[in-house]
Swiss-Prot record:
Encoding gene (name): rpmJ1
Any GO CC annotation of this UniProt entry: cytoplasm
Keywords: Ribonucleoprotein, Ribosomal protein
Entry keyword Heme: no
SUPFAM superfamilies referenced in this protein's UniProt entry, alphabetically: Ribosomal protein L36
Family as reported in the entry's similarity comment: Belongs to the bacterial ribosomal protein bL36 family.
Keyword match Ribonucleoprotein: yes
Origin species: Actinobacillus pleuropneumoniae serotype 3 (strain JL03)
InterPro entries the UniProt entry points to: Ribosomal_bL36 (IPR000473), Ribosomal_bL36_sp (IPR035977)
Molecular functions per Gene Ontology: structural constituent of ribosome
GO terms under biological process: translation
PROSITE patterns associated with the record: RIBOSOMAL_L36
Name listed for the protein in its UniProt record: Large ribosomal subunit protein bL36A
Length: 37
């Protein structure tokens, strides 16, 4: 899980979702998991 000010899709499997007011990137590649913080 990377914590970043700006979350971006890194590949075509990445999805940007908002959970409980937190922007996250979910992906089949665990290295691409991000959250805004």
């Amino acid at each position: 899980m990377k914590v970043r000010a700006s979350v971006k899709k890194l590949c075509r499997n990445c999805k940007v979702v908002k959970r409980e007011g937190v922007v996250r990137v979910i992906c089949s590649d665990p290295k691409h998991k991000q959250r805004q913080g």
